[in-house]
């Protein structure tokens, strides 16, 4: 995972490193997955694919062709828009994976599974899955985490950047998951 925005100067050394890595070990042993936001504009009631097209173009300009695109959106992306992403990003339609925003990050793997992300990774590397994937434990955890009837406890976090939502994200997640584990 590189993180950030494609084209930002901070990420360029890392992008160059993974480009060289792919060349060194061989393209058949690497899979570039590009996570992109596909915004929905309420004012025009449409999904915009242009930002995704531009970010893939930017990746290509530095020598990286994504093999798969995961499109994050507020709502389901119509097939014609997915085909457009496929066409202009030079990625097979089956590797244009959508993930609609979920309530909690614990739902994301279930969403990816439902979209066939695992199958596409297996197929890309020519790997036969050994057994059927059992998502029941993951679904159980998700159910616990999304349960609205859990008790609440007030905990104060004292720090310099408490007004910034993500400043203490890891601590927030730790407290959240420890409570879910306690309810399990």
Regions from the PLM with identified roles:
Residues 2-4:
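Switch II (G3) loop of P-loop NTPases
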Residues 10-19:
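His/Asp/Glu-rich metal-coordinating catalytic cores
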Residues 93-154, 161-170:
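Flexible inter-domain linker/hinge segments
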Residues 33, 154-156:
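Conserved beta-strand elements of the Class I
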Residues 30-126:
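Internal gly/pro-rich beta-alpha loop/helix module
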Residues 21-24:
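Substrate-engagement module of ASCE P-loop NTPases
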Residues 176-184:
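Single conserved hydrophobic/aromatic residue that forms the stacking wall/gate
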